[in-house]
Amino acid sequence: MGIQLLPLHRMEERHIGLTQAIADCFYEAACVCLDRHHAPPQEFDLHGDSFKQKTLVEWKSTDDRSKKAWANKDDATRDGAYAFALAATELCLGLCAVSRAETLTGADYYIGLRDKSTDDLENCFRLEVSGTDLDTYEVNRRLRGKVKQALKGKSNLPAIAAVVGFRVKLITMQKVYDES
């Protein structure tokens, strides 16, 4: 089997926790982040607790208007990382966005199985996300920080931390376990 495509396009059709406007916004931010360092398409490494694989990332190069709209690098990186992390959890774990998480939960999104009822978050995971344009060391440092943040969250749901390294073409994910 060939390299699987990272499912960044039309995410609202699979992630009920995203509207079309939000999915489009996250995708556009991701394109701006990718264009800082690369030309399409590119292969990214995807690392998780029990897997290491490559994924193909395809995107449309952004124009000057999009780059100016996303001139705040922090906002673009955060929102682009949301797109990548949600697409990666879908591809590797079969989990999709169910809802945005509340403040202080130690997460950005709740993710769950696509074909399960989402009225109750009991069967969901929390997803804590970060993105960076720096090196692999920084990706790993941020992952450790996101794990700690998820552990401190005011929620008893299990969590997954994810960090996207746009420059180094790396997506890392780690399940978070409460050791108490």
Give the residues covered by each predicted segment.
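Nuclease-adjacent, charged terminal/linker segments that flank catalytic cores
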Residues: 1-60, 64-70, 174-180
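A recognition module on extended beta-rich or small alphabeta surfaces enriched in W/G with H and D/E
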Residues: 2-12, 16, 20-24, 130-179
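A short, highly charged nucleic-acid-interacting micro-segment common to nuclease
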Residues: 66-81
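Conserved catalytic cores of phosphodiester-cleaving nucleases, focusing on short active-site segments
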Residues: 84-93, 109-111, 120-134
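Short beta-strand
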Residues: 98-103
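Short beta-strand or tight-loop elements
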Residues: 105-107
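Flexible, charged surface loops at secondary-structure boundaries
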Residues: 119-124, 152-156
